[in-house]
C-alpha cells in the first residue's frame, strides 16, 4: 500500500508540474501570436491566459472572454479577430500540446489523457477533469507493473 501512496504522490506532483508547463506554453503562444499580429495588450493577455489555463479545459475560455472584452474596448475588429485566433490556438493546445505535455509528465499516453479528461468531466465536472488524469495514471502504472511482473515470472520480458 505504501508503494501506491508514493506512486500517487509522485504522479500528482508531476501532474501539477505538467499543468504549469502547459499553461506557460499556452500563454507564450498567445503572447507571440498577438505580438506578431499587432494586437493590443499582448503581454497582459498572454499572462492572463497562462494563469486561467491552470484550470483544465474551461480556464482558457474564461481568460479568452476577459481578454476579448479588454481588446473590445480598444478595437472591436481586433476583438473579433482575437476570437478566431483563440479558437485556432485552443484547438492546437487542446488536441496536441495538452495531451502530450501533461501525459508525458504523468507517464500516460496522450489518448489516455483525453479519455481521463472526458470521463472525469462527464462524471464529476471540472473537479473530475483535475482528479481523473492522475487517478488514471496511477491505475495505468500499477496495471503496467503487474503485467511486467507476470511476464517476467513467465520469462517473457519485453
Residue ranges and their predicted role:
Residues 1-72, 76-82:
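Alpha-helical transmembrane segments and their immediate interhelical loop/hinge regions
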Residues 80-158:
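Hydrophobic alpha-helical transmembrane segments of membrane transport and translocation systems
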Amino acid at each position: 500500500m505504501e508503494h501506491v501512496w508514493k506512486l500517487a504522490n509522485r504522479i500528482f506532483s508531476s501532474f501539477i508540474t505538467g499543468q504549469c508547463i502547459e499553461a506557460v506554453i499556452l500563454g507564450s503562444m498567445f503572447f507571440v501570436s498577438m505580438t506578431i499580429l499587432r494586437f493590443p495588450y499582448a503581454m497582459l493577455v498572454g499572462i492572463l491566459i497562462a494563469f486561467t489555463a491552470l484550470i483544465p479545459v474551461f480556464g482558457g475560455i474564461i481568460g479568452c472572454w476577459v481578454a476579448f472584452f479588454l481588446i473590445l474596448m480598444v478595437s472591436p475588429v481586433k476583438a473579433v479577430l482575437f476570437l478566431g485566433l483563440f479558437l485556432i490556438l485552443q484547438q492546437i493546445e487542446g488536441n496536441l500540446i495538452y495531451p502530450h505535455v501533461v501525459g508525458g509528465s504523468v507517464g500516460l499516453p496522450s489518448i489516455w489523457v483525453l479519455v481521463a479528461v472526458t470521463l472525469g468531466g462527464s462524471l464529476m465536472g471540472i473537479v473530475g477533469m483535475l482528479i481523473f488524469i492522475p487517478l488514471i495514471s496511477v491505475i495505468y502504472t500499477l496495471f503496467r507493473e503487474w503485467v511486467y511482473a507476470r511476464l517476467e515470472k513467465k520469462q517473457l520480458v519485453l
